[in-house]
From Swiss-Prot:
Keywords, alphabetical: Chloroplast, Plastid, Ribonucleoprotein, Ribosomal protein, RNA-binding, rRNA-binding
Localization in the cell: Plastid, Chloroplast
Membership in a protein family: Belongs to the universal ribosomal protein uL22 family.
Gene3D superfamilies from the UniProt entry: Ribosomal protein L22/L17 (3.90.470.10)
NCBIfam families: rplV_bact (TIGR01044)
PANTHER family assigned to the protein according to its UniProt record, in alphabetical order: CHLOROPLAST 50S RIBOSOMAL PROTEIN L22-RELATED, LARGE RIBOSOMAL SUBUNIT PROTEIN UL22M
Subunit structure: Part of the 50S ribosomal subunit.
Pfam families: Ribosomal_L22 (PF00237)
Any one Gene Ontology cellular component term annotated for this protein: chloroplast
Protein name: Large ribosomal subunit protein uL22c
GO biological process terms on file: translation
Function: This protein binds specifically to 23S rRNA. The globular domain of the protein is located near the polypeptide exit tunnel on the outside of the subunit, while an extended beta-hairpin is found that lines the wall of the exit tunnel in the center of the 70S ribosome.
Gene giving rise to this polypeptide: rpl22
Record's keyword annotation contains DNA-binding: no
Length: 115
């Protein structure tokens, strides 16, 4: 039985819809660290930027805190949860106001080392 360590990184209050983030997360779930970075580099979605940062942070945590090699890391779990919504109003005719909800999300990446 092998003893696998896992490391976590979380990015909170990302100003993007969790639905759009999850579309990209589904592409990299279960991939190796280097393969995930390559996929994110060439995807045409803006969600790739914040996800790329979180994956880099998780790899840095693995190297600095646990002494793990970045080349042996795989993405074990990755998910995006809803954050609070920024509430804004849009003025409309005759004194009315329409509500605008700007979504935020929290991205969590859990990586583990393979032997």
């Amino acid at each position: 039985m092998s003893n696998t360590q896992s490391v976590t990184a979380v990015a909170k209050y990302i100003r993007m819809s969790p639905h759009k983030i999850r579309r990209v997360l589904d592409q990299i779930r279960g991939r190796s660290y280097q393969e995930a970075l390559m996929i994110l580099e060439f995807l045409p979605y803006d969600a790739g930027g914040p996800i790329w940062q979180v994956i880099h942070s998780a790899a840095a945590n693995a190297k600095h805190n646990s002494g793990l090699d970045k080349k042996k890391l795989i993405i074990d779990k990755v998910f995006a949860d809803e954050g609070p919504k920024l509430k804004r109003i849009r003025p409309r005719a005759q004194g009315r106001a329409y509500k605008i909800l700007k979504p935020t999300c929290h991205i969590t990446v859990v990586m583990k080392a393979i032997d």
